[in-house]
A protein has these predicted regions:
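Membrane-embedded alpha-helical bundles that constitute the cytochrome b-like, heme-associated redox core
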Residues: 1-211
């Protein structure tokens, strides 16, 4: 019990200021893109555009926000792509992901700085964002492309929206309610040693020199 209390009182650095900056750059721009895109695409959600400055303004700002988002994701890729490479333990983790959902992390292979679910979401974001960028550019300048290509771009944009959007919702849940303490790491950059040892034991052992 005393050991656990001591770990609660010790903080470890998880994210740098730059890492937090690009995370929030991507998160905020994606939120705008998500809601403005929903309003532009579906009449049922057109009321969102009034909140976001009107239809014409949203149609103008959406692709610009898309460029900002793409730059942020590119910086993420440069920073984290190597860390998101899946290994054998990650495959085992994904096969037993039900234990993570149930809060039974002790039944899974020890996670490093990022668990397999976070790594998988990272690749969903990287690939989905590449689709967003290419298809979005075609949709932004439709007169420069054939109608067939524009239609394919719209379809791919919609598919990427569904896949990345679903992953984003899960990510927000797990980063707040699902795993308490996660959100603070993207605000202050720090987590308690107990949090690190409980959720990312392999990483914790590495930073204290036991890995």
């Amino acid at each position: 019990m005393e050991h656990t209390k001591n770990l609660e009182d010790v903080e470890v650095q998880r994210f740098s200021a730059f890492e937090r900056f690009i995370h929030w750059l991507v998160a905020i721009s994606f939120l705008y893109l998500f809601f403005s895109g929903l309003g532009i695409y579906s009449p049922k959600f057109s009321w969102l555009l009034a909140v976001l400055g009107g239809k014409e303004f949203s149609a103008w700002l959406h692709p610009i926000a898309g460029i900002v988002y793409s730059v942020g994701v590119f910086l993420m890729f440069l920073k984290w792509a190597k860390d998101f490479i899946l290994d054998a333990d990650d495959i085992k983790w994904l096969k037993g992901a039900k234990h993570y959902i149930k809060g039974e992390e002790e039944k899974l292979p020890e996670a490093g700085k990022y668990n397999a679910g976070q790594k998988l979401f990272g690749w969903i974001v990287f690939i989905g964002s590449a689709v967003f960028l290419v298809s979005g550019l075609v949709m932004w300048f439709p007169n420069s492309f054939s109608i067939t290509l524009v239609r394919w771009a719209i379809l791919l944009h919609e598919i990427a929206f569904i896949v990345v959007g679903a992953g984003f919702i899960v990510h927000v849940y797990m980063g707040t309610i699902g795993v308490p303490g996660s959100l603070s790491s993207m605000i202050t950059g720090k987590v308690s040693a107990l949090w690190a040892a409980s959720h990312h034991p392999k990483w914790f052992k590495q930073i204290i020199g036991r890995g």
